[in-house]
Amino acid sequence: MMKKMISAVLALTAAVIGHAQHWSYNESAADWDPSDFPQTPYEVSGQVHTATVDQAREWYQAMARQFPDRCELVDMGPSDAAWPIQVFVISSESSDPIKVLVNNAIHPGEPEGVDACMLWVRDVLLVEGSSACNQVEYHIVLHYNVGGALNRNSQSRANQAGPEVYGFRGNSQNLDLNRDFIKMDSRNAESFERYFSRFQFDYFIDNHTSNGADYQYALTFFFTHADKLHPALKDHSLSLEATLRQDLFLEGWINAPYVQTRDHSPESGLVGFFETGRYATGYTALHHCIGICVETHMLKPFPQRVKATHAFLVAFSNRMATESMLREFQDLELSLRRSFSSDPWVQAGDYLPIRFELSTVPSDTLDFYGFQHGYRSSAVHGQDRLFYDRNSPQTFPVPYWNHYLAVDSARVPRAYILPRGYSREVLERIGRQRGVSVVGITKDTTMELTVSQLLSMKTSQQPYEGHYLHSQIQTVEYSRPVRLQRGDMLIKVTPENALFLVNVLEPRAPDSYFAWNFFDACLQQKEWFSDYVFEDMAAEWLETQPLVKEELQAKMKANPEWATNAGAVLTWVYQKGPWSEPSVNEIPIYRLY
């Protein structure tokens, strides 16, 4: 028996080693030494490898040593791996600068931003006369997903042309960190939130590689959807996006919105990507920071994708450095400050949208630079498969659906109140947010508050990012006296934090804390009954409640099969009577109007 067990262990070990060897690689070509500075690891490799976590840190340390008065390398905070998230900060000459956060390697298999940022930083700091940072302060995240960046391989990005070696999408918990900004299951997200709140950034750039259709563009990007932005930011965001597209086009970079097709191919039209708070740019928008997601095309050679990302950074920084942008930003900043104080853009009793649906009417028509596509028989499964003919470039008009309509809204309260028992799961997440303060109630009291009762919802049958996400949530709201205990937590709603709080505390919002399972305990009944004990109690109670008894008899007559289920009938009576638990399906998020 022991020999059989040893043989089985050895066989399993061989299988595991065999699988690990499938993700093996040789990175000798990417050797980089600080003596190579100011060349980047990407350049030393012959433009075939992306910088590792160690190489990026050493390169930026060398840059910080050369320009100690202008830049520094700092820790954003811990990650889920053993290494912290690091940020390279280029200071501004202005006392009140525009603040920009650039994020790289949230998906480490999409690493263009890592290398493009090094090239851009070198341009800014080593080229005399650069005005990029005269009025702008840049914070550049080296590798946000440190754990995924350390898990390097050459196989996991099957649809991508290089680099030869790259990181993995999942972090050290196997989480997709670009779905974690509301639920904050990772230490990465906690560190991001603290850093983001501390510096109160005005713009956020998230660098990615696309998946999906084939087309001529190396560069696509989208701005966080204007339909859900603070009104003061909407026009500015739309104007800046249009200006950047034109600037890039004049520099020879044809570009398009992120290519999300309505059907299988671009000819069917494009649909604007709507990011809720789980995504990085969706999260920053909830805090009045304009987010931009850069998506270079997966099938373009890695050097071309790095150049495309670099071109976007150059276009953005050049635009930020103009006097007209400074004046526009100063006006915008003043407008925002007024909307948070003397002229509030939202007040208690107003309604904020929490759920959007795509308009059925196209908002624009785009000239799309694509390839002719067709179908042919698959050599794998024998069915028709899609293919693109890169020898047949085409430009053709496509409809663009990019307008989203609010289909649900929530009334803004003066404050939310949560039981202290939710301090670990919910209150700690809320208390760290920008512009949010949480205070404890000092004594037991009873208040008339508004609560939500769950009517229906759907729950995913498969785990999604460590949760079983709720969707299509329907509730009914009502007021009742609520007994509050000393230590329960009050969260004041202000014009600055209302957008965030409504989107996480209103249960029907798609990325609410309820949707992410933080209140699932309220969905379970805690006390029950023994049939033989409850039979007599139920009969006696029904005799005192003739209307309920009449309702029961009508229900049994209308549903004969149900009437034969004794347990179901007793449960119905139990839930109608004084024994039912009012807390079941009542979501313990209280609103004070």
Feature-to-residue mapping (PLM):
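Sec-dependent signal peptide recognition
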Residues: 2-11
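Hydrophobic h-region of N-terminal signal peptides that target proteins for export
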Residues: 11-19
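Short glycine- and acidic-rich boundary segments immediately preceding or forming the N-terminal edge
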Residues: 25-86
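Acidic/histidine-rich, surface-exposed loop or edge segments in extracytoplasmic proteins
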Residues: 28-48, 102, 176, 224, ...
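Divalent metal-coordination and catalytic microenvironments
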Residues: 52, 82, 105, 140, ...
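Active-site/substrate-binding loop(s) of hydrolase catalytic cores
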Residues: 96-106, 110-275
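Hard-cation-handling environments
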Residues: 262-453
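Catalytic centers of hydrolytic enzymes
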Residues: 420, 428-432, 439, 443, ...
